[in-house]
Amino acid sequence: MLALGKLLDLTLAGREPTEKIQLTADGTRLHWLAEGALEVTPIGARDNGVDLLLSAGIHGNETAPIELLERLIRKVAAGTLKPAARVLFLFGNPEAIRRGERYVEQDMNRLFNGRHEEGSGNEAFRAAELERLAQVFFSKTERVHLHYDLHTAIRGSKIEQFALYPWAEGREHSRSELARLRDAGIEAVLLQNKPGITFSAYTYGQLGAEAFTLELGKARPFGENQEVNLERLERSLELLIDGSEEQPDGSRLDGLKLFSVSREVIKHSDHFRLHLDDDVANFTELSPGYLLAEDIGGTRWVVEEVGARIIFPNPRVKNGLRAGILVVPAKL
C-alpha cells in the first residue's frame, strides 16, 4: 500500500511524508497537503463532478470517526476503492488526537466563521488552516460540494446517530440530502436556524457546500469503538466516493426524525447551574415547567415548550458559550 495511505500513522507520529504526491496503480492521485490533510483526485475519465470533504478529529478524543476515515483512505491507497469523486480527508486537530484529548487549549469547533481571529494558540491557527484548505478545495465551480464533519459525543444519546444541518440566509434545507443521511443510518436531523461557528457552519454558510455535523455515538479511545456501529455510514461513503450511489429520493423522508432549535442555554457566569445529572443523555425529554438552569442576576431557564428535548448539555463550557440546546419536533 502507498505510504500516503497511512495518513493516521503519519499524523500520530507528527511526521511529513517523504513523497507528498503518490499515484495508485489505476492513476488515482494522493496529495499530502498539510498535517492530517490528504486530497484524492480520480483519473479524469472517472471524475463525476463531486467534491467530497470528510473531516474528523476536530475533537481529538472522538476516535471512531477518525478510524472510519482511516479505513477509507487505506482502501483508496490500496486500490480497492476507486474514487470517482474528488475527496479531501482532514484529521482536524492533530495535537489533540496525539494526546487523546478533546482539545489542547480551546474547543476548535467554536473557532470557525472568523472566531479564530479573536483567539490565539494551536487550535485557532489550525481552524484558520482548515478554513483555507476547505476554501481551496471547494473553489472549483460547477461541481457538487458536500462536507461531512464526523464526531462522537461526550455523553450517550437517546438517538444514537444524528446530524446537525447548518443555516444560511436565503438557503433551504435539501430534502435529497436529508434522504441521503437517512439512507446512511442517520436517525434524526437538527435543523438549525441561525449562523453557527462550527466547521460545517463555515463550509455551508461561506463556501456554499451542503454541509453537516454528524454525531455518531459516544466518544471512546482508539481501539474501543466496537459498540459504535458505522457500517451503514461507511458503505454510503464508499458509494459516494466511487460514484455508484443511487440518487437519494427526497420525496419521502419516512423514518427520519426532524428537530429545530427552540432555545440555546448560554452560560453567562461562574454562578451558572444546570439542573441535570452529569450522565443525562442527549435528546432526553423535559416536561413544561422544569427548571433547567439558573445563572447570575436571577436568570432562569424554565422549559415552556411541549415535546422539548435537551442536547449537548455541558455546564463546564467557558462563560459566554452555549451550555445546552433545547430542541422541539419539526417538519419541512
Curated annotation (Swiss-Prot):
Pathway: Amino-acid degradation; L-arginine degradation via AST pathway; L-glutamate and succinate from L-arginine: step 5/5. Its EC number is 3.5.1.96. The keyword Ubl conjugation does not apply. GO terms for molecular function: hydrolase activity, acting on ester bonds; succinylglutamate desuccinylase activity; zinc ion binding. GO terms for biological process: arginine catabolic process to glutamate; arginine catabolic process to succinate. It comes from the Bacteria. Binds 1 zinc ion per subunit. Its cofactor is Zn(2+). Zn(2+) binds at H59, E62, H151. It holds the Pfam family AstE_AspA_cat. It catalyses: N-succinyl-L-glutamate + H2O = L-glutamate + succinate. Belongs to the AspA/AstE family. Succinylglutamate desuccinylase subfamily. Transforms N(2)-succinylglutamate into succinate and glutamate. This is Succinylglutamate desuccinylase. The gene is astE.
